[in-house]
Amino acid sequence: TKYGHVKGEIPGIDCYEAGHPVPDANSFAATEKALTLVQGLTAEDTVLFLLSGGGSALFEKPLVPGGELQDITNQLLASGADIVEMNTIRKRLSAVKGGRFAQHCAPARVFSIVLSDILGDPLDMIASGPAVPDCSTCAQALAIAEKYQLRLSAQAGALLAQETPKALDNVTTHITGSVRELCAAAAEACRK
């Protein structure tokens, strides 16, 4: 979670604070811990994956140097890119986004419980979709990089040109809350 949001210890649960909206060394370390936990799982195992908005920065294993990923994230934030554009780029620069975390868990089943913070609940965009197939394309990522004239290394540019997983057969996803539900509850409270 973001710095300052852990309100105490939870027995049996490791809590990590990290950078948001820009990932930092704690983001990378916490993600490495999660990846260590899912190594060697079998088809008999099930991963319960709880996911909410903010995960794009908090859950990260970059495929480019960490400082470069931070720079690209800052460029996107300064450019005015929307969350879908930002996450389309982020997915291609990460070893866990765009369905790749689910691949790390395979052959185990992944049961993903999602709290959506994006209108329309596009599963592949919530926290950059670490446990769902990616609906965005490399063509879209390249167009976004061009639109915002992102300064990218050759390595980052090559990653944007690569596709992400488009199918995952080991994942079940359930949205437990969304912006739409929040707005409906707020409207109901106002009517009372």
Q: Where are the predicted features?
A:
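N-terminal loops that bind phosphate or other acidic moieties
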Residues: 1-192
